[in-house]
Regions:
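A structural supersecondary motif
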Residues: 99-102, 310-314, 329-369, 621-636, ...
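N-terminal cofactor/phosphate-binding cores enriched in small/glycine residues
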Residues: 33-120
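Non-catalytic terminal extensions that flank enzyme cores
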Residues: 2-55
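C-terminal regions of mature proteins
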Residues: 2-8, 233, 402-570, 715-819, ...
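Acidic/histidine-enriched segments that form metal/cofactor-coordinating
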Residues: 2-5, 81-83, 90-217, 323, ...
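Catalytic or ion-translocation cores adjacent to nucleophile or general acid/base/metal-coordination motifs
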Residues: 83-86, 96-100, 255-283, 578-580, ...
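Non-catalytic accessory/assembly modules
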Residues: 81, 139, 143-174, 178-179, ...
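His/Glu-based metal-binding/catalytic segments typifying zinc-dependent metallopeptidases
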Residues: 48-52, 57-59, 167, 171-172, ...
């Protein structure tokens, strides 16, 4: 057997894959091998690690110097049928039938990536097969192009409009200030280079893309000699190469005429660095501004509180010293540059980072929310502050804080939006795509040790970095993005002109033919026989027993000699521990509940023990990885097992409560210092810094305003659910539209009064008692547990007092327009923008019942079939989904970036009626069960495993009930699913609350509802 990790085999080939390099990756306790296929040029990088969650990713360099969105449209389109899998949507069929822990497609400015992950090997290879066929051998027919990209449609009144999934998705992207400001900044810094264009597509330019250009793009960029296949996990390299060789290599050789003198030739097989075709290498060239200048752009005013003003410097290639410099200058609010910008009151929020997504980075320092006329003040402040920091030096505390922050980040294992291997994939591709060795960015801990050595050796090291990157560069770019109230009007006018131009050249006969073909294609419902080509795992092959994280309950003696509940979650945290100290807020009068989110935010931001907030932040950053305020609310499910579970702990008063408190994370070697500081914070919290509270208030308002559009789906859900029960009403008060009204009411002149209120709330919460939760590994626990009794006394933790259950009558005064939540008319959340969101809520069965499991299966099938076909594929929305929250006894349907959100609700309700008379085939039910099972076995990070297990205990829903849900799931039959469909339809006739987030144009002629004001 070929040994891929034997250096003696470098230069030798296995099935024509030449082993080029072996990389030791001690930072990740792994090693990697780099190979190139000597006939096709396909390259492979496999990070070999003892991890059963294997990941593959087909990646292609896909650069374009237009904003027509061809890379993005291609990303969608290759997943719409291929040679071996000639379905409408193999991707969604695969996603709805596999055990994947991650399955996606991602368009970056310089590449397109198709990753998939699974903990089941057979399932992993199934996904690799379907994805490989999709990227190398897609159908790419004209119907797919006009469905996913752009087309002209005509409504019932004869009015023309432009439609398309990507087109509508990107209209949503052009609906708020911040993403447009960032995009314009990047365009300015790299003029006439690929980053200056929108790889996702600008809706005003997407219709310029022709079908032939689309086909040519695939031919050019999706060839095997431009494919970078990233692999991660414990499946042996030879098995993966055997699979690629068997399924694809021969077909690729034939398709691309891979022979001497053929379409692919002149490959430098022995090159230790990636081979990049010359035309692609030319596209990778970045252009830079050659002299300092001032630039101004306009962006939509939606989400803005003023202009974005920044000073920018080119910084060269990415490396760890730039990350260190960012952390020193702006790693936390007390860092010197961040502090100066905040204290200036010239803007709402600090912007400082190195833009590292390209081969060359640039630093950006400035402010959001700058009032007109203050731009020059911001530029001068940034330069003046950097000069002062250089002249005066950086304090040791700021350096220690930065070192702690980076050390912690490099040690912590997180799942942000997928497996940890996705982060390794991105690090690898950053070098690989640009012609650097694949391991260039895979030694961050080792690299940072060199930075720490420089810090130890040279006291002026940080000063020299400031001089190198900020004071010496001859090119400085002053950038301003102003909010424009005319932005949407101007784009709408441009879109109207575009449609008029299209109409002038429109061949209406051909248009009708194209649309007829498209609609026939979209309306075709694939049979089980057709979808059977997608490989699946059978229910009989599934492990019935699943991994369940555990949390144990112990007690320690509190300051009042009572037993304080101590929850312990033992997980593999890599020498890090997480501690929650929580206090109930459910003994407060209801009028204070609306202020809980801001109260939690400020807990660690106003200082303690007589020290200023900045001093406290700097000190805590040297000891802890982080500390922040948190809230937690919920209810005990109305299920006999959950009620019985909660009854077991009734004497301790911790089940079914609402909590506020602190969570901190720290390295175990700093445990004693960290716990002492946490006790000091809890007992010596200050509420007297009026000036800083005003700053935090301004930042909160800006944050809420900036995020309104992007959180539209969340706001519709919470709004539509608010009238159903007390817990959901509280969610609306704290996190929904009602919270926006609360934040709008915060005024600077009330800061003193608010501090007094927060002080009262804090004291009342502390008097209500407390609980502690620890997540750490076994070695850390041995060190921590002896410290906890002393900590509980120092922190003055006391026995939990009984809580109060708020009634709807108590809560309703704090829900804006509460009467609108009580009927089934649509609640219209009106905002400016170019797209929308919808939510519809109907009743479901109770938690842990077999009926609930069947409803979960039906909802998943509905999402992946009917809603996908009718709302996403035909309707043009970017997404539509349905799921069951049986804890709250609700079925939730939502749409995302939806051009017709009101119509989507109508389609959903009509579909329920139609499906009652159209049974779902047994094979489809079984596939959906397998997919739902896959959701149950997705791995979690150590921190998240501990948190979920702990939170489950607080609400009578321990993680072991997850096994009950899996057992019920595996027993679901097609008859159960039919009955679930009937229940959905019957429930919808009785009660369906609805909310739509969009501009006024979303309303249809027949839609009636309540208009709900969106403030800020």
């Amino acid at each position: 057997m070929f040994n891929f990790t034997d250096p003696a085999n470098i230069g030798k080939a296995y099935k024509d894959f030449v082993l080029l390099a072996i990389d030791e990756l001690p930072d990740y306790k792994a090693r990697a091998v780099y190979l190139r296929h000597k006939i096709t040029g396909l390259e492979v990088y496999h990070i070999i690690k003892d991890d059963k969650e294997n990941l593959f990713a087909y990646a292609f360099r896909t650069l374009d110097k237009t904003s027509r969105g061809v890379a993005h449209i291609m990303e969608h389109s290759v997943l719409c049928g291929s040679e071996k899998y000639p379905l409408k949507e193999p991707f969604i069929t695969l996603a709805s039938t596999s055990l994947n822990t991650f399955l996606n497609a991602l368009t970056y400015p310089d590449k397109t990536v198709y990753p998939g992950a699974s903990v089941v090997r057979a399932d992993y290879f199934n996904m690799m097969d379907v994805y490989g066929d999709a990227v190398f051998f897609p159908k790419l027919d004209h119907a797919t192009f006009i469905q996913e990209g752009h087309r002209v449609e005509m409504d019932e009144d004869g009015k023309l409009s432009i439609q398309g999934v990507v087109y509508n998705e990107m209209k949503g992207n052009y609906s708020s200030f911040q993403p447009i400001a960032f995009s314009d900044l990047i365009s300015a810094m790299f003029p006439n280079s690929y980053p200056a264009f929108d790889s996702g597509g600008d809706p005003l330019h997407i219709p310029e893309l022709t079908y032939q250009e689309f086909l040519d793009f695939h031919q050019k960029f999706y060839s095997p000699d431009n494919c970078l296949l990233f692999l991660y996990g414990d499946i042996p390299t030879y098995q993966q190469l055997d699979f690629i060789d068997e399924r694809f290599i021969g077909r690729l050789i034939k398709k691309y005429d891979c022979r001497e003198g053929g379409a692919i030739c002149n490959i430098d097989i022995d090159s230790k660095k990636p081979v990049i075709k010359m035309d692609i290498k030319n596209l990778q060239t970045l252009n830079f501004l050659q002299e300092s200048c001032s630039l101004k752009t306009l962006a939509p005013e939606t989400g803005s509180t003023g202009s974005f003003v920044s000073l920018n410097w080119y910084a060269g290639k990415a490396d760890i010293e730039k990350l260190f410099l960012c952390e020193v200058l702006c790693g936390n609010d007390s860092s010197p540059l961040a502090r100066a910008l905040k204290d200036s009151k010239l803007g709402d929020d600090v912007q400082f980072q190195s833009f590292g997504q390209f081969r060359e980075e640039f630093f950006c320092a400035g402010l959001w929310g700058v009032k007109k006329g203050n731009e020059e003040k911001v530029f001068n402040l940034v330069e003046k502050t950097l000069n002062e920091i250089y002249e005066n030096g950086v304090s040791q505390e700021d350096i220690d804080s930065a070192v702690m922050g980076i050390d912690f980040t490099l040690r912590e294992v997180n799942r942000y939006w997928g497996p940890f291997s996705i982060q390794l994939m991105e690090k690898t591709l950053k070098g690989w795509c640009n012609g650097d060795v694949c391991s260039r960015h895979l030694a961050p801990i080792t690299s940072f040790e060199r930075v720490k050595a420089e810090l130890h050796k040279d006291p002026d090291y940080t000063k020299k970095l400031i001089k190198k990157y900020f004071l010496d560069p001859s090119v400085k770019v002053r950038f301003v993005s102003e909010p424009s109230e005319n932005y949407f009007k101007e784009r709408e006018a441009a879109e109207k002109l575009l449609i008029e131009r299209l109409e002038q050249n429109l061949d209406k006969v051909q248009l009708k033919k194209d649309l007829d073909e498209l609609h026939a294609y979209q309306q075709h419902i694939e049979t089980s026989e057709e979808t059977a080509c997608i490989p699946t795992t059978k229910i009989s092959e599934l492990e019935r027993s699943i991994d369940i994280p555990e949390t144990t309950l112990e007690f320690i003696t509190g300051a009042d000699d009572s037993d304080i509940p101590l929850f312990i979650s033992q997980e593999d945290t890599n020498g890090i521990f997480y501690v929650d100290v929580l206090f109930p807020f459910d003994r407060l009068p209801a009028e204070y509940l609306q202020h809980i989110p801001f109260f939690a935010d400020v807990l660690t931001n106003l200082g303690w023990n007589g020290k200023g907030w900045d001093k406290c932040t700097a000190q805590s950053s040297c000891v802890m990885g982080d500390i922040w305020g948190r809230t937690l609310s919920g209810s005990i499910p109305d299920a006999p097992d959950c009620i019985a579970e909660a009854d077991k702990y009734r004497a301790y008063n911790f089940c079914g409560r609402n909590w506020v408190g602190l969570i901190c994370k720290a390295l175990t070697e700093r445990a004693e210092e960290a716990l002492d500081m946490l006790a000091e914070i809890i007992t010596k919290m200050d509420f007297d810094d009026k000036k800083h509270l005003e700053t935090l208030m301004t930042e909160l308002k800006a944050e809420k305003k900036n995020s309104i559009i992007s959180n539209g789906r969340d706001y519709t859900q919470k709004r539509a659910r608010a009238g159903w029960n007390e817990n959901l009403a509280l969610n609306e008060i704290m996190w929904g539209v009602s919270q926006l009204h609360t934040v709008e009411g915060y005024k600077k002149h009330d800061a003193k009064k608010m501090l007094k209120m927060f002080s009262y709330m804090y004291k009342e919460c502390l008097k209500a008692g407390s609980i502690i939760h620890i997540t750490s590994d076994s070695d850390s626990l041995k060190k921590l547990k002896p410290l906890l009794s002393d900590f509980a006394k120092k922190a003055q933790l006391t026995k939990l007092l009984p809580g109060h259950h708020y009634t709807m009558d108590e809560l309703s005064p704090y829900i804006s327009d509460f009467e609108a939540c009580k009927d089934d008319k649509i609640q219209f959340l009106n905002v400016p923008g170019q797209t929308g969101y919808a939510s519809a809520i109907i009743p479901s069965s109770s938690y842990l019942t077999k009926e609930a499991s069947a409803e979960n299966v039906f909802a998943a099938w509905l999402s992946n079939h009917t809603l996908w076909d009718k709302i996403r594929t035909t309707g043009g929305a970017y997404g539509a989904s349905c799921w069951v929250d049986s804890i709250e006894k609700q079925v939730i349907m939502t749409t995302y970036r939806d051009p017709t959100p009101v119509k989507s609700i109508e389609v959903y309700l009509q579909s329920l009626k139609e499906l009652c008379s159209t049974p779902i085939p047994k094979e489809e039910v079984e596939k959906t069960i397998v997919s739902n099972y896959g959701n149950a076995i997705v791995p979690a990070s150590p921190k998240d495993r501990g948190a979920r297990s702990f939170e489950g205990m607080l609400y009578g829903n321990p993680q072991r009930f997850k096994q009950v849900r899996v057992d019920n799931l595996l027993e679901v039959t097609e008859e159960d699913v039919e009955k679930a469909c009937d229940r959905f339809y019957e429930s919808a006739q009785k009660h369906c609350s609805k909310a739509v987030f969009s501009n006024n144009s979303a309303k249809t002629k027949n839609s009636a509802g309540n208009n709900i004001k969106i403030p800020l």
